[in-house]
Every structure is written in C-alpha cells, then in structure tokens.
Amino acid sequence: MEKRGPKRRQQAAHLSCELCRERKVKCDKLDPCTNCSSAGVICVPVRRPRLPRGAHAQRLRRISPEDPEAPIQIDIASPPDTGTIAEDDLKERIRRLEALVDSMRSSNHISKQNQEAQDTIESTLNGIDDDSLLIKGPRVHPSDGGLRILGLSGSSSPETGWASIIEDRDISMQLCQVYLLNVDPVIKILHRPSLEKWMLQGQRYLGFPERHAAVESLGAAICYVAATSLTETQSWARFHTTKSSIVARARRTCETTLEKSSPLLSPEVTTLQAFLLYLVARRSEDPSRAVWTLMAFAVRIAKALDLPRGTDDNFFGQQMRKRLWLAICLLDFQTSLSQPSEPLITVAEATSSFSPPKHINDSDFEPTTSHDIPDREGLTDTTFSLVSYHVQAAGRLLNFEPSVKDNGSRQQHVQHFEQRTLRLLFYCDPESTPYAWFTWHRIQCFVSGARLSAIRPLIYQHGDHPIPIPDTNEGTSILSLALNILEKVQLVHTDPRGEGFRWFVTVPWQPLAIAISECYICQDRALVQRAWPIVEAAFQQHEADVSGSSKAISTTLERLMCRVRGKLLQSLGASTKITTSPTFGTTNAANTLSVPHTPPSRSSITSSGDLLSNWSWTTAELSRPGEDPALLTEALISTSPQKIDPLLFSLDSQLLIAGQEQLVEADQSWAAWEEVIASLHDDETGRADMFLS
C-alpha cells in the first residue's frame, strides 16, 4: 500500500471583512471591499484557513494569534510539555475576562453582548483540557471603557454610510443649524459662538487638535440630538429622507465616537458634554429605562471632574462647568421620576451646589474672557435653562425632601420659585421670536406645576406625614391647574411656533392623573364636559409618547380612564364623546380644545412698563412707565403672592375655568389622589414630577 504523503499546508482564504461580518451583509472579498469603500470606512480584511464544518467542527482547535497562517490543530497525541506557555497565557486571559463579566453582573439587565461574552468564556473553558490547545481569544478593547459591553450601542442596526455623517460637511452643517434652533435654547451647555466657528466655519474647537476624540464625539452627539429634534416634515425638507433614517445613522455614529473617546476615563469636560447630549437624545428617542441607567455614569463622571465645585478660575470655564452640572442635575431629576428610585444627586447635594450661571447671552463673553460679566435683563440665551434649573431645585424640595411636610413651608418654596422665575421674564415679548413664545408659555406651565405640586405632593403618605390642606382663599382649583398644564403642552404641539421644541415637551403623567381623578369626583357636569376632551387628548398623546417607559404608570392611567369613562357614560350619556377625542398635533385640535391666544405683541405696547400691565397683576408699581428696572424687581419680590398671579399671564377665560368649579371636599379629593399614588407604589413605580415632562 502506498504510503500517504504529508498533509499539504492549507492556504489562507480571503473571507468576509470584519465590518461586513458585523453588519451581516454580503462581502465581495476585495481589498478593500465595495461596501466599505462606499461607506467611506477602513476595510479590515480577514485571511485565515477555513474552519472545519460538519462532523469535523467538534475537533477544531483555534489558531495561535502569533501565527495566523499556522495549520488547524487536530486531536492527536502530543508530548506533555507541548503548549504549556500558551495554556498559561490562555488561563490569564480567561481570568481577566471573567473578572470583567462579574463586574457587569450587578446591573439589573444584562445586555446581549454581555451574555455572548459569558457564552464565549464557558465554551472556552470546556476545551482547555488538551495540552496542545492554542486559542485566539475574542478581541477586547480596553479603550472603550466598557461602554460596548454595557450596551451603549443598544439594538440599533447600522446602515450603509453611517460613519460618513460627520465627515459629510453639508449634513453636519445642516444638523448644526438644527441644533442651534431646536436644542441649544433649551439645553444650554455649549458656547454658541465657539460652536458656530467650529462646525459652520471650519475653525478648531477651543484649541483642541484636529480630529481629537473628545471633539469628534461632541460633533456626533450634536448631530444625534439635532436629528431627534426634527419633525418628519423638517427631515424631508432638509435631508429628503425620513427622520428615523437620519436618527439611526446619527445615533450609530455618536455611539461609535463615544466609545473611542472613552467618557468613563476621559479627563475632558467636552467628552462629558457629548455624553450628556447623547443621553438627552436617547431619552427623546427611546422612552425605556436605558437613560435612567446610564445617568449613573454621567453623575459619577461629573463628580470625578469636580463639576459641583467649579474650581476653574477662568470665567468661561466657570460658566461651562455650571451649565453642565445643572443640566446633569436636571436630567437626573427628570429620568429618576419615571422609575422606582430617587435622584442620584441628593437634595442636600443639589441645594449646596446650586450656583446658576449668569443670565447673559453667549455673545457677551469669549473663551478668553477673564473678568466677571453682570446679569442682563430681559430674554437672553440662558433664560429658559435658568428657569429649568430653578424648577428642578424646587421639585426636589417639594417631592424628595422629608422635612418639607406642612403646607406653609411648601407654599413658601413655591413663592420663592415664582419670584426667581418672574424676574427672568421681565420685558419678554412672546411675539418677538419662537424662542420667546415658547419660554413665555412654558414658564406658565412650570408655575402651574409648582403650585399643583404644593397642593398635591407626590410624597407617599405613610400616616406620619400630615396632609397639606390647600388654601381655598387663593381661588385656584386643582383641576384648573392640571388643565392649564395639559393645555400648554397641547399648545406647543399645535402652534407652528412650537414646532422646533415639540421634541422636548411631552405630556406629564402627574397632572394627567390628577385631572382624571378630579373629573371622577367633580360634581359640575358643565365643567367636566369642557375638561374631558382635553383629558382624552392628553391621555392618547401620553400613551403614544411614552409607550414602554413605565408599565405601572400606563396601567394606573388606564384604570383611571376606564373608571371615569364608565361614570361619565352614566352621568353625561350620549351628550359627550367619551371614547373618542382629538389628539395633539391635529388641525382641528386647537379649535376643539379652545386653545388660548398669545398675549398682544410689542407693537401694541407703548412702553416696557405697559408690557407688564398686560399681566393680571394689580400692583401699581409694575405698570408705571419709566421705572428703574431694579425698582421693578424689588417691587416684584416684595409683592405678596395673592397679588402676583403669574398663572394669569393674559390668559383667555377659556384657558382657566377658575370660578366655575364646585370645590369638592378636601378629604374626598385627597382620597382619590392617594389612591393613585398607592397604586403606583404597589406596582413598584417611584415618585414623579409635577411640572417637568
């Protein structure tokens, strides 16, 4: 019998490249391949011997990483000392990988990538009993800071051309313009002139070198949050494609650049700014608890960078640090309210570190500014953000501070919030710009929410907390406050001036729940007939916006709606449409819900003092023309809360139905509200905010 010759060395095959294999698309195996060339990315070819298949797959022995051209090892007898060094190296790699996976197990939900890593370890451990084992382990990139295995990339599938969205100057410039219009006025963490010089004029950003990882991640985050702020109409007008397509590409780019910049380890404040913008965009796009989970990283990174203290001596650096820290406090407050937990930043820490930035425009200072700049009067670039910062501070005290129990202290906090907020709204003409219009109406919503939170706190009553009794002499009803918030949200979603800010405004579930419960116990049939279409529209919009966010909240609202619908069908009969109602964003919704008109424009006002006289304030000092603004401010602060009613900022009688309600007994109204809170706690849902969506 002729003796079989030695086995011929297997030639390395040109397999699918790494990116095509990751994206699960067909690769033409060129160098570079056509897919990578069209996407504008670097093609990483894979050349190695083909792996055995079928019955021979179980006999596979992986190739040594030091010799990718080596033949595949098969089960044959080998000397006892063969592969000892490789086995020791393998065990060390496995030990480190196991430690990484164990550190991830503390998370409430393990990502798909984490589970795949555990499966890889288990399959590897089952095969290390052979001495001749040479393994090429999975690639672990320590530079990504563990973000990929934490699930930062999510489940979004990459699309062709996603990597070129930053390098495409036309797209990046358009998204930057969208950011300056829709995002920058409400999320004020960047310096507008520096951003324009960088992304619109092509200059370097704040002295960073070209293609710095932190700057690239910030640019990608700006594009991502700008894409989420687009409406479908704006997306087609600017990019000739759907909004979902732009958002998917921008999100994938943002996540990739963030992983490269390693925000968990980076000492740059710019990287944290990019990470925060990513969380803002992700929260707008994804209502799940992913952002609530990732907020822990943002808070820890901010503390590691010493943001609460703001030790930077430069005026520019101080302003940027203050803006970023308070924006993190705001997002921490918002995200924790929809989940069964209190904010990560405690009330004491948020109060002690509350140092708001200057009420100025971005054009008033530059990165080289070292001297202090005084606050401006009137509407500035930071007005809305400053109001939001005061909102989260008041919301923490009213909802998460155990010492704030009695009605007097709660009303004092509300009065303090109103005084600080109204000072920022001097000489604001809502007809001047969409930003001024949006700020005007959102502040009314915030004031209503603060008053509603003082009357109906969200702290669960365990019996040891006294129930705050509302002051009936104020003439403001609970249902009117709740309806005012819902109508203001609907106004932003129907008025063309609110188009750029609709991504930021959703229906808060707390005023919605209060309005539903108050309709159940209200005895005024005419009032319920006028209020119920507003409640129905808000409920439908809430279900569409936050589907998947909190099952307990959705279940509680559905139970309330079913109960009230059943009662209204019996009491009102066929005169009221119970199951069908207008939805936000429709053409007829404004007429159906009697949306109020905006206050008169500045053209019909003869002086700055007359502008304040259009508000329902009876203080004579506020209506005199020619008064010193400082004196007007002092008069505003010294005025009693009964005389200052910011809830009535030139509102039509249709907006508030005050004076038409029959006040129900306090114990009956409280019983309905406590039932809602108890239901949420039974479903393991935490407290939430009354005036932040």
Swiss-Prot record:
Protein name as it appears in the record: C6 finger domain transcription factor nscR
Disulphide bonds in the chain: none
Keyword GTP-binding: no
One Pfam entry name: Fungal_trans
Function: Transcription factor that specifically regulates the neosartoricin B biosynthesis gene cluster.
Xref: SMART domains: GAL4
Sections of the chain in a coiled coil: none
Superkingdom field: Eukaryota
PROSITE patterns cross-referenced by the UniProt entry: ZN2_CY6_FUNGAL_1, ZN2_CY6_FUNGAL_2
Gene Ontology, cellular component aspect: nucleus
Keywords (A to Z) from UniProt: DNA-binding, Metal-binding, Nucleus, Transcription, Transcription regulation, Zinc
GO molecular function, a single term: DNA-binding transcription factor activity, RNA polymerase II-specific
Entry annotated with the keyword Transport: no
Known DNA-binding region: 17-43
Subcellular location: Nucleus
InterPro entries: Sec_Metabolite_Reg (IPR050613), Transcription_factor_dom_fun (IPR007219), Zn2-C6_fun-type_DNA-bd_sf (IPR036864), Zn2Cys6_DnaBD (IPR001138)
An individual GO BP term: DNA-templated transcription
Annotated spans, Disordered: 589-608
